[in-house]
Amino acid sequence: YRGNIMQQTAKMSGARVWLNKMKTTFSKPQNAILLALGILLTFSTIAPMISIALDTVTVHVGSVDSHYTGLNEGYTLYNWQDLFTGRLAKVNLWTPLLNSVLLSVFSCVGAIVYGGMFAYLVTRTNMRCKKYLSSIFIFPYIMPQWTLAVIWQNLFDSNLVTGTSDGLLAALFGIRMPLWWCQGMFPSVMVLSLHYAPFAYILIGGIFRNMDANLEEAATIMGTPRLKIFARVTLPLVKPAVLSTVLLVFSSAMGSYPVPHYLNLTTLCTKYVQMGEKRAGEASILAVIMILFGVLILIVNQRTTSGRQSYTTVTGKSGQISLVNLGKVGRCMVAAIFCVATFFTGILPIILFAIETFLPNPGDYSFIRNGAAGNLTTKWWMTSENITENGMYGQKGILFNEAIWGAFKGTLIVAVCCALLAGTIGLLVGYCVSKNRRSKWAAYVNNMAFLPYLMPSLAVGVAFFVFGSSMGIFNTYLLLVLAGTVKYIPFASRSALSSMMQLSGEIEEAAIIQDIPWHKRMLNIII
């Protein structure tokens, strides 16, 4: 009897100790918020993935799986069997998959070569016009992907080759580029490489700026050839930035839809849209494949960052950087080449888009050939009715078009809501993870917050499309806000985490000693 009492007492004391630990743990706001964020991010990230995984084996009424199985409801593996081994497997899966992988790989190579070379020239040489070029070089990354794709069409398309209206070169100079130049893999790779090159420049250029010049100077004093210094000293230091660029550009290019769509390249994204409702289950499998690529990239990122080498300069970093001398002619010539390149990728798109809005018809550049400004028109802007005006396809001008203004209003609503929600959640993730750096739960929350960035955008959209349909919020602003928030949380969380890592813990501890509430500490100190 006495032994039973002692066992019960031990159990009660153990439970009391556990409760006290829980109270102590969750008395800290960052721990309670971290738990809530983990549950929220798990639901918002994993639940749509589960929904789309179930959609791959669900029978869709009116789809091919329902037709060939004779079922109107339930589950079937027909979609998997038909997509991987069916008569159209090559067209629906293997060719788009190969094109997607090749597009992602070549875009990575192009972005790193172009952006990395520009970063080296700006930070480590005496090239002229550095400030101007640094500012204009990031323009393609600021602009949407489809803008460069449309500019490529407006420059190189021709009625004889592509069957569309003549582009600028064909209309003015009679130059008609071959089909492989106008459509397909090559232009898609070029456009995405130019679009993501600023991303490589930002990451790699930051390493070049902060790199200790003493390391290269020591190798120079030892008589090491400059090429060997670059290969054995410089490249290992920028390897983390290059690897980060590869992972992020690969995942972004894998999920690119507008560029392959405009430039007529069949990828997983474009094939998903083409399948539509007739092969809804097989289309969901394509989205699952893209999600698996994102998960694979996350695993590779974790493996590489966990085993990454650390280069530490014990004696401090030199502030003097020895710039490579390109020579009087070389520094001007290199600057001129990049000025021309950045003009075509950063300034010309804006000019051409502005001109296109005043052309009477697409590809009609007669005002340049004839020198007659009267051939231009403002009908695309100023037409206030859609009955007597010809060539407007039943639409009013953009300034009087209710549909355009409604879409603009909806875009602003979604953008503002996504920015506020993603910014707030990302800030809280960065704050809580920085306060629990050694916690496995914090690492899990950080990975859940970052995972949507590594997944193709279309895959995220498809997952929320299926999830929203099952939850009854399909075709609502709420679904758009949820999908946009989850997709852009990684940007906010990573930037917030980087900022929180720079804050000393003593600042908040001093406020805690003064009994300042948590919300005031966040508003007046942390933020």
Model-derived regions, located:
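Short helix-to-coil transition segments within interhelical loops
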Residues: 125, 211-238, 265, 436-437, ...
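Short, membrane-interfacial amphipathic segments enriched in basic
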Residues: 7-23, 68-77, 83-86, 370-374, ...
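Membrane-water interface segments at the C-terminal ends of transmembrane alpha-helices
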Residues: 29-65, 84-208, 237-257, 262, ...
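C-terminal transmembrane helix and the adjacent membrane-cytosol boundary/short C-terminal tail
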Residues: 5, 13-14, 129-130, 198, ...
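Transmembrane alpha-helical segments of polytopic membrane transport and secretion proteins
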Residues: 1-36, 128, 303-341, 440-442
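Glycine-rich helix-loop "coupling/hinge" segments at transmembrane-helix boundaries
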Residues: 65-69, 157, 255-278, 314-317, ...
